[in-house]
Amino acid sequence: MLALVFTFLQLGIVSALTYFKLAPWARAYIKAVGDAPREAWPAKDPLLVAALTNRGMAVSVLLGGALLVGALSLPQALTGAAATSSLPLSVPVLAALIPAALVDWRVQHLPTRLLSVAGAVLLLGMVLAWLGPQVAPAGIDDVATPLRAGDLLRALGGGALVYIALAALSLLPQLWGRAPGIGMGDANLYVILGPLLALHGWSTLLMGLYLGFFFGGLVALGLLLSGRLKLKGRIAFGPWLMAGAAAALALSVS
């Protein structure tokens, strides 16, 4: 029980820090109109404004965090087994990515600044999880299992491998003057999702990547069949990569 309370306390602190860091950057983004692709941003779009304003950022982080806590943390907590530190770490990181997903959905652009916030949360969380008992309050000896050095090496290696693969898919077609099938923003996204998934194992990393492409492919096929997307058209892929990662994490603890 103390482990669950301590985990939720950590989630609350990290999510709050995420929100306060996102808010000023969000306001700057919604006002920026001077350089591409921001000059094409529909600044009056209700969903985009909701994602990038102070209040909308709070709702995104808190709601996303609450949903992900239920999907990822509670099933294992109810079994009575100690959760690994990578499990509660998933919640604030994925919650921090929700505003970036909303932006990508509307304008097909993953803002580097919003991604960097989630990356900073991931890095901080990995360090805290690695320290484990050293940072736990006195008297709490049933906290989540700390990460080992091998877990961290697998996370960094897995993230690097997937990033290189996605970056190649984005850059190589441009050498022949063709439009890339995947953007560099999606590759940058896996700098965050890759290590997060790899913390749970190589199978979770591969499952998350597969499900992301599967979800994105299903959406693209549906849009093609409905006539809302042309054969050479493009869709926002970031939200589906995030959905695939969340699904893989949920399946890894079910």
Where are these predicted regions, by residue range?
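A membrane-topology feature that recognizes alpha-helical transmembrane segments
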Residues: M1-S254
